Amino acid sequence: MRAPSASRLSVIGAILIAAALPAASALAQAPEGFFKGRQMTFLIGAGAGGGYDVYFRTFGRYLVRHIPGAPTIVPKNMPAASGLAAANTLYTSADRDGTTIGAFPNNIPMDTLFGNPGARYDARKLNWLGSIGKLENVCATWITSPIKTIAQAREREVIVAAAAATSNSAIMPKVLNALLGTKFKIVGGYDPGSGMTLALESGETEGVCGLSWSTMKAARPHWIKDNKLNVIVQLGLTKLPELPDVPSALDLVSDPVKKEVLELILIRQEIGRPVAAPPGVPAGRLEVLRRAFDDTMKDPEFLAEAAKLQLEIEPLDAHAIDTLLANAFASPKAIVAQAAGLIEPSAQK
């Protein structure tokens, strides 16, 4: 029998190579293998060093440990307009291959509904990975203030410190004034960290409304230990077990329409500290990211570091966020309009 000719061997080799290419290509594009050796970008819609930033940077370090291929991740702070810059960037111009994700303050998922004119995204079309935890906001006065209860805040003007006009510290006292009849006088423009702290401690202001309870415990634990604060009301869909004697704002609203407005606004608090990928990420890679998020939320090392930093972790998965948003966007137009008027006065409905 004659040996195959060189030309015939070349043809056979070409056929074998061609047959192998689809399998090799499929392997290279497998979602689990895509992230190997890649650098991810993590857009953080908050300033460096603040409460949101500490949460998100801690989370980001552990997230990549649960993504096959162990990619690296580079945080990029984009605090402008209370996180709108980060959300707009993620939605309009970020890579849609799964290598860019974003994390935001709690206003971002609802700003589309409330008609924020600066929002160039549809929150329902972002690919949510989950939320690190809800916001457990409270209103509190300093120990020297004569206002010790929410009832007293309905009788007498209370000067409260606030950051930007779009911050919780500015929005929540305005909401309570409208729906509960409180008399908070909002003094805005303070730095959300040290500025508001100094204003309270110096007596320049009497209190703050929309304060994150978990962030405050992490940043100012001595305030609790030394009983420096009078916590007068809770701002959430559910109450904090550790503050059993502090009433919930929802429990104080008797008018059913006002209650529905407040419930809609407080969905922002429930969503809390959300993380998302842009629209258009391939389904397999999105599943990898969502699985990595869920695994991070159960990672003992992550939870231990969070506890050390006094960061409370109460995660929501992607489905929970999608459900909250679907319910919010299904609200009656009249309720949305009233809520929007308190959250975003320039909204055009």
Task: Label each PLM-derived region with a short phrase.
Residues 272-278:
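A short beta-strand structural signal in non-transmembrane regions
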Residues 36-38, 225-228, 252-254, 260, ...:
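An extracytoplasmic/periplasmic, membrane-proximal ligand-sensing/linker region
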Residues 29-272, 341-348:
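Conserved hydrophobic/amphipathic secondary-structure segments
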Residues 10-22:
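Bacterial N-terminal signal peptides
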Residues 24-28:
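Sec/Tat signal peptide C-region and signal peptidase I cleavage site
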Residues 47-48, 278-283:
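Structural beta->alpha junctions
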Residues 1-13:
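Bacterial N-terminal signal peptides that target proteins for export
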Residues 10, 79-81, 310-312:
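Short, internal active-site loops enriched in acidic
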